[in-house]
């Protein structure tokens, strides 16, 4: 019977409706929707907090290393992200950590400083569902990418060594790494394609590096 079916091009029964699960597609957004998260990295000198932001659409990444990860540091990170990005940031997505939002029990607390920075700049602040970290998967993947290229591959005596390597990696990622999700473009080239104006990219507080490419006035915008 099997050979008979093969001879007539019927080697298997047709799929019936509902056999294959339908995968929901992510909603597309214009550039300016950033996923933000905090991770931890280690050097011989001690631990640092890695603040990471990545644009959902352009994949442009912005990172900083800090000794602490409090709400004031998070608010400062957001302000510098806004300064570094040449286009309007309309939405940020974070988890429910105290760096980004008040706890549910803090009913008498003032409006969170991170939320105030969002309001001051016309940014919608969205939160992931509690105990659903995968809803912020884009930045989780970027965290892994950064760690695999830095602390999981190299040994750093000092924080400054890690900062310099991280700065070089993020610059190479934004300006030289071609991504399948961008149809072979780099994040920089994709943003240029959008017809925007100016961008200045730097990983703070890393010291200036002559090998790190920066965008400024007179770039493709």
Feature map (PLM): residue ranges:
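Mobile genetic element proteins and their domesticated derivatives, centered on retroelements
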Residues: 1, 37, 53, 59, ...
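Basic, flexible linker segments flanking DNA-binding modules
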Residues: 1-36, 98, 105, 109-115, ...
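RNase H-like two-metal-ion nuclease catalytic core shared by retroviral integrases
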Residues: 94-96, 104-118, 123-147, 158-167, ...
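Mobile-element integrase/transposase regions
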Residues: 6-55, 60, 72-76, 84-89, ...
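A short acidic/small-residue loop/turn micro-motif
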Residues: 67-71
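Short small-residue beta-strand/loop micro-motif enriched in glycine and branched aliphatics
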Residues: 60-64, 126-128, 152
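C-terminal domain-tail junction helix/linker
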Residues: 121-123, 144-221
């Amino acid at each position: 019977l099997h050979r008979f079916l093969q001879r007539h091009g019927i080697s298997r029964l047709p799929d019936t409706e509902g056999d294959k699960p339908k995968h929901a597609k992510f909603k597309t957004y214009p550039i300016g929707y950033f996923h933000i998260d905090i991770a931890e990295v280690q050097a011989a000198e001690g631990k640092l907090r890695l603040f990471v932001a990545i644009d959902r659409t352009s994949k442009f990444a912005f990172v900083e290393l800090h000794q602490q990860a409090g709400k004031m540091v998070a608010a400062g990170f957001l302000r510098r992200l806004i300064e570094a990005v040449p286009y309007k940031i309309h939405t940020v997505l974070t988890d429910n950590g105290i760096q980004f939002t008040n706890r549910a029990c803090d009913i008498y607390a003032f409006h969170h400083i991170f939320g105030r920075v969002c309001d001051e700049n016309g940014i919608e602040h969205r939160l992931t569902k509690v105990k659903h970290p995968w809803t912020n998967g884009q930045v989780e993947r970027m965290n892994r990418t950064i760690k695999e290229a830095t602390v999981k591959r190299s040994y750093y005596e000092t924080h400054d060594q890690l900062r310099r390597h991280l700065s070089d990696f993020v610059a190479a990622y934004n300006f030289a790494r071609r991504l399948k999700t961008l149809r072979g473009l780099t994040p920089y080239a994709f943003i240029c394609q959008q017809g925007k104006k100016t961008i200045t990219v730097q990983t703070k507080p890393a010291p200036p590096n002559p090998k790190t490419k920066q965008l400024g006035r007179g770039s493709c915008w």
